[in-house]
Amino acid sequence: MTLYGHILAQKYMAGKIVTNDGDTVACMIKVGKWDTNPNRIVTERNNDTKKYWPTEIASFHVDNRTFVSARVKLEVSNHLDGTLDLEDSRPKFANDSIFAELIVGGKKNLYRYKSPSYKEHFLISDQGASLESLVYKRFHVWAKVSGNEVKRELHLEEYKNQLEKYFAGCPGFDGKIAVTGYELGQLRSLFSLYSGCPN
């Protein structure tokens, strides 16, 4: 994208921020294309422009989207084709302060965070609780196929164990979790089903 196109892709829209003290402040928020989650936001109020990092506000809402600030532990292994770890299924973690987008809200909340490297993370929380990152990793192993050694892709799906604990007490959910992939549509569908759970 050219600089001119980048400027055109950004505009101010009416929104609000929630401060770390719990106050809600109406303001204009600069909205870009946001292929990845923003690592900071720019606001304007009464001709006063301010920039906020995740540690400086609790959340913000703009363009029918809500982002919450969180300090989380993310799985940061290489995720692009051609860069996957070989013979190493162990997750690698790093702490980061992020703006996570709320995808499904209620008693059980689902969030998404797409990093600057375009790695997609999903996070969960109960109402009022801290966010927890769902753990998933793609990796390669050597496998014999027709007598030849080839690389085969496997997946560490710890997130399914996390979700079984998270939805404990909801009848029939274990079977649904077992077939839920680590992708936005399937996870959103799973969380939407929870609204029908008697617990």
Label for each model-derived stretch:
Residues 8-199:
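Compositionally biased alpha-helical segments
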